[in-house]
Amino acid sequence: MSLRPLHDRVIVKRIESETTTASGIVIPDNAAEKPDQGVVLAVGPGKKNDKGELSVLSVKVGDRVLFGKYSGQTVKVNGDELLVMKEDDLFAVVEK
């Protein structure tokens, strides 16, 4: 099974954040209150603006993005947990 997002939705695979520093210090979950990261797996075609024109999304497949801990809806596809969310739920694209 595969997913094709509609409108301004994106499908993101969460990247687990590091829980140990380079020096070996373990970071407890409650101390790691920072945005989650993920990789965009699929993007919808966009959504129509007030003029009826299609506004394409700012993110593309392969982008690494930041989003809130409770953003999106979790779905399980072929054993993987993926997130379906609106582009507005994304905070930023991580530039290399």
Swiss-Prot record:
PROSITE patterns: CHAPERONINS_CPN10
Compartments, as annotated in UniProt: Cytoplasm
Example GO biological process: chaperone cofactor-dependent protein refolding
InterPro entries attached to this UniProt entry: Chaperonin_GroES (IPR020818), Chaperonin_GroES_sf (IPR037124), Chaprnonin_Cpn10_CS (IPR018369), GroES-like_sf (IPR011032)
GO molecular function terms noted in the UniProt entry: ATP binding; metal ion binding; protein folding chaperone; protein-folding chaperone binding; unfolded protein binding
Major site of localization recorded for this protein: cytoplasm
Keyword tags: Chaperone, Cytoplasm
Entry keyword Cytoplasm: yes
GO annotation, cellular component aspect: cytoplasm
SUPFAM superfamilies according to UniProt: GroES-like
CDD domains linked: cpn10
Domain of life: Bacteria
Assembly, per entry: Heptamer of 7 subunits arranged in a ring. Interacts with the chaperonin GroEL.
Family, per entry: Belongs to the GroES chaperonin family.
Chain's role: Together with the chaperonin GroEL, plays an essential role in assisting protein folding. The GroEL-GroES system forms a nano-cage that allows encapsulation of the non-native substrate proteins and provides a physical environment optimized to promote and accelerate protein folding. GroES binds to the apical surface of the GroEL ring, thereby capping the opening of the GroEL channel.
PANTHER family (UniProt xref): 10 KDA HEAT SHOCK PROTEIN, CO-CHAPERONIN GROES
Protein name per the record: Co-chaperonin GroES
Organism name: Paracidovorax citrulli (strain AAC00-1) (Acidovorax citrulli)
